[in-house]
């Protein structure tokens, strides 16, 4: 017997504002940890001070050129992470080396809070600075709900869904969207707009989606859809 014939089809879960609970979206060790003072100091530096410190350590770098790079705003690649290695060369030169960029980076669940009074931490920072402005530039007349699509890391993906609900003050669909799902809870209608299926087998239009889909996303996410996708393929 085929397993898909036994298990019920996956469906989107509706997340309401006010449902965020920190213990669901951080590892206990990180949630109870205190961030290192040096790291916290760096994260609170102004852009100008960061540029000055970097140019002091790298005299050949021009401050204006670095400022221009930091001012650049991508059209499509709005959210990224990087894997870094602290390396030392044969001549004893130490530096950080970027070995990979990620379009759906993880790490929020491992990052201690920089401010104990802001319990949503980096989740809210990302949503307020990136996703909210992205959604507010919506296409004229496009109706529908918001969604978080994921195929990994439910601890963080659900955290983003809960924070989006709080920031945008509306319900958000939290949607599993796996590469090998024979009956996925996501489809596109005749107008090329995304729809998601809830637990009652009802389909809902989506005007914008936060992508946490990493395994061959091009197999499932249409390039030419009316739904705005945060970090499209």
Label each residue range with its predicted role.
Residues 1-233:
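Preference for protein termini
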């Amino acid at each position: 017997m085929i397993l898909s014939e036994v298990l019920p089809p996956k469906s989107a879960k509706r997340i309401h504002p006010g449902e965020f609970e920190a213990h669901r979206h951080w590892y206990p060790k990180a949630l109870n940890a205190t961030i290192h003072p040096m790291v916290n100091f760096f994260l609170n530096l102004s852009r100008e001070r960061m540029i000055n410190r970097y140019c002091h350590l790298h005299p050949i770098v021009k401050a204006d050129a670095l400022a221009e790079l930091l001012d650049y705003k991508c059209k499509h690649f709005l959210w990224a992470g990087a894997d870094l290695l602290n390396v030392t060369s044969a001549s004893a030169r130490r530096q950080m080396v970027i070995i990979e960029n990620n379009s759906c980076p993880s790490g929020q669940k491992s990052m201690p809070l920089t401010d104990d009074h802001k319990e949503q931490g980096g989740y809210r920072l990302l949503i307020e600075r990136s996703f909210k402005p992205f959604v507010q530039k919506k296409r004229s007349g496009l109706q529908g709900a918001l969604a978080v699509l994921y195929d990994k890391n439910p601890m963080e993906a659900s955290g983003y869904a809960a924070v989006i609900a709080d920031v945008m003050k509306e319900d958000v669909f939290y949607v599993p969207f796996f590469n090998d799902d024979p009956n996925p809870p996501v489809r596109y209608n005749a107008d090329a707009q995304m729809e998601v299926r809830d637990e009652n087998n009802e389909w809902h239009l989506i005007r914008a989606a936060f992508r946490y889909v990493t395994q061959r996303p091009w197999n499932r996410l249409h390039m030419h859809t009316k739904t705005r996708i945060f970090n499209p393929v």
